């Protein structure tokens, strides 16, 4: 309990404020929730009562912005870097298999937005290296999805969202 309180107290003020609002307004309807704080490039997993369970660095869309273009039939590699945005918003999310059968947290199916374990990507992207740095400044590299450490996804996201939907705030 003390470690969880310490984690929340060390979270950015905006994360603490949104957590208090979610609980006081019951916006999550008692469901677990996950917050992605874009400025700090971190994800925070909470249970339905607002207890902070886990925190991890994340990778986000290569471009800054809050609105994402809905993908069309073009391959992801055809999306220009300046359009690779992790959008801001609130969504009901659930675990589901991706096209390759791997479990992901589907945030917005229509926009192909999900939170998933870090992918290797192109060698020049050095996704694992970017996630390992202490600064969030280099954590913008994805096509828009949120990439999380494998252990964070397996030990926090997957069990918390198993068998139930939850809310994602970005």
Residue map of PLM features:
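Extracellular/luminal recognition modules and glycoprotein regions
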Residues: 1-34, 55, 63-69
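A short linear-motif detector with a strong N-terminal bias
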Residues: 12-16, 21-24, 36-38, 70-73, ...
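Solvent-exposed, polar/charged alpha-helical surfaces in well-ordered, non-transmembrane soluble domains
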Residues: 20, 41, 154-155
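Mid-length scaffold segments of soluble, non-membrane domains
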Residues: 39-114
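Exported/periplasmic cell-wall-interacting domains
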Residues: 84-170
């Amino acid at each position: 309990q003390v470690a969880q309180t310490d984690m929340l107290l060390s979270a950015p003020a905006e994360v603490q404020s949104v957590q208090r609002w979610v609980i006081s307004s019951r916006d999550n309807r008692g469901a677990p929730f996950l917050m992605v704080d874009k400025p700090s490039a971190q994800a925070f997993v909470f249970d339905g009562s607002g207890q902070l369970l886990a925190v991890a660095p994340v990778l986000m869309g290569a471009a800054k912005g809050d609105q994402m273009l809905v993908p069309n039939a073009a391959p992801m590699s055809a999306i220009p870097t300046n359009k690779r945005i992790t959008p801001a918003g609130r969504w009901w999310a659930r675990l589901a298999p991706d096209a390759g059968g791997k479990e992901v947290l589907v945030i917005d199916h229509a926009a192909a937005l999900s939170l998933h374990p870090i992918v290797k990507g192109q060698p020049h992207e050095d996704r694992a290296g970017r996630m390992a740095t202490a600064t969030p400044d280099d954590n913008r590299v994805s096509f828009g999805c949120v990439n999380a450490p494998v252990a964070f996804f397996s030990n926090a996201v997957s069990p918390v969202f198993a068998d139930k939907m939850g809310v994602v705030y970005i």
